[in-house]
Regions:
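Small, basic N-terminal interaction modules of short regulatory proteins
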Residues: 1-68
Length: 68
């Protein structure tokens, strides 16, 4: 998984897995969902990210432990 922010275009891209994108769907006018040939999610692209997300406080926590 990879999260990238492109400051010059104010675009946030979250890539969930590597793969060839064969279908891109508009979730709304500023959000694209990219799918592979099996219909699995590859990435989400968010335009105008600064006004639509809280980029300044973005962080994640990785949890490790026994599966429930």
């Amino acid at each position: 998984m990879r999260v990238e922010y492109f400051e010059d275009t104010d675009t946030l891209q979250i890539t969930f897995k590597e793969g060839t994108v064969v279908d891109t769907r508009d979730l709304d006018e500023n959000t694209l969902v990219e799918m592979d040939a099996d219909g699995q999610l590859v990435a989400i692209t968010i335009e105008h990210a600064q006004e639509r997300t809280d980029l300044e406080s973005f962080l994640y926590k990785k949890h490790r432990g026994a599966a429930a």
